[in-house]
Amino acid sequence: MTRVVIKNANLVDGTGTPTRMADITMQDGLFIEVASSGSAGTMGAERVIDADGALVTPGFVDVHTHYDAQVSWDPWLTPSSWHGVTTAVMGNCGVGFAPAHPDRHQWLIELMEGVEDIPGSAMTDGIDWQWESFPEYLDSVASRSYVLDIGTQIAHGPLRAYVMGQRGADNLPATEDDRRRMAELVEEALRAGALGFSTSRTPLHKSKSGELVPGTMVGAEELFEIADAMARIGHGNFQFSPEHIRVPNEEWVWMR
């Protein structure tokens, strides 16, 4: 068993209580004791770290990242891992890389490049495309090791283009069959381990060529059907970037 003791830490524990000096003991990667400074025993410890008053905090959870491509090549997921982030959530803003027909790969790269200003050349060189469906994307991510925990959502942009083809990419209305199929794929994604679903309704989000993210112009009916699918599963986060135009935004009415 591996035992590590951090002594003389200026602890910020995340509960809202004031900082305090403390000793922290970990065993096999788990915190087992937080004690007053100077009181922790070090016998049997493989490592003793003197924090010397440095701040020590729990790992940060970054609920809004866009590592959807970077997970293909970067086990460190920088820069998050440089700044105390221990859990990152991706698949935000309606953009991502699954599900994906092979002929949509470059289009999805240019969509992400436009929305998030991530160099397309890096994504083209780095993504290995070992998937088509969203569950296969999760399998690809799960087959790799990272220095922090990650979770992802199924994004509206790739979902719409996967089901509807160019009609979906062009933000044309979905048919009843389209909506049903998108809802089925969201259910499938949640059952496979997706944290939820994301969409973007802001015209500020555009592809490299200036196209709006698929889903930007859809009405309530399409989003409600997806929300109903999530309700049938019984869990899942529904994340959206609001439209930023009308005040109050239409989405607030939908949430009632």
Residue ranges and their predicted role:
Residues 135-138, 142-146, 171-256:
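Histidine/acidic residue-rich metal-binding segments in metalloenzymes
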Residues 6, 47-49, 89, 151:
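Hydrophobic/aromatic beta-strand patches that form the interior of the parallel beta-sheet core
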Residues 55-79:
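Di-metal (Zn2+ and/or Mg2+/Mn2+) metal-binding site signature of metallo-dependent hydrolases
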